[in-house]
Amino acid sequence: MTDLQTPPQDIIRGVRPAQRAVNATLQSDGVNLVLDAVSEEEETDLLALVDAGRWDCSLSRRVQHYGHRFAYSTKTCVPVAEPPPPAFTRLAERIRPVCWGADGGRDGDLQCTVNEYLPGQGISPHIDAHGAFGDGLVAVTLGAGCAIRLQRNRRHEAGAPIHTLWLPPRSALVLSGAARYVYTHGIVSRKGDLVDGEWRLRGRRVSLTFRRLPPPGPCACGFPESCDASGTAPKLLPTRLRGSAGGAEPPGCDAKKTVCASRVGVNIPGGPNKYKT
């Protein structure tokens, strides 16, 4: 088993160390990291609530959608029958001032996606579709921590630096302004992260991602060069759909279990055995 303090060099070679603090560049572009956004007790309750729900197993990892879900075929949000649970809306309201402002948002526009990341799973760098969601997104980390990769869209800014930020348990990552509309965000598919000079094996991480629907009318993001709604930029979406799934659950997947059988011992394409930055 890999030692946490002295991992083999062939594993960590090329892995970018994760920073604990948001640097000045990220801060000015709209990145904020709220530590201890939820208490340990609240984290336990939220995880129990999530695991009592029904998982969608049609993607490369398990997800749940509340309020609305993103439709990959039309690149828009469509309503779902189940609204966000009261515990989710209370959490979103608590975070509202730091992301959307005290008066931000409209009744019924809150969308929440629950993502489960098992060790070795990740998500490719992407920008949330401008036409589907408004400014400001919040990702609350439950369970294990993880490193996230942030970078300005290289299509318009060649050589833009890569920022790797450590998301500790119970933290809330806030992306607004340029960080939401111009930066790609993603999680490298690997089984550990380099933090404080130590190789930290990943555990099960559950992310609660809160977004709001955009106001009616054309996108007013203010970043036309990166706008996939009213501008010319292509949609930088995560490559996480199963090519032949057709929305069906993969064999061995039980939507009510904590871990799908189809996930155990499976090498996700480009995933568990890849340790690149």
Where are these regions (language model features)?
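Non-heme Fe(II) oxygenase metal-center motifs and adjacent flexible, charged/small-residue loops
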Residues: 1-260, 265, 270-277
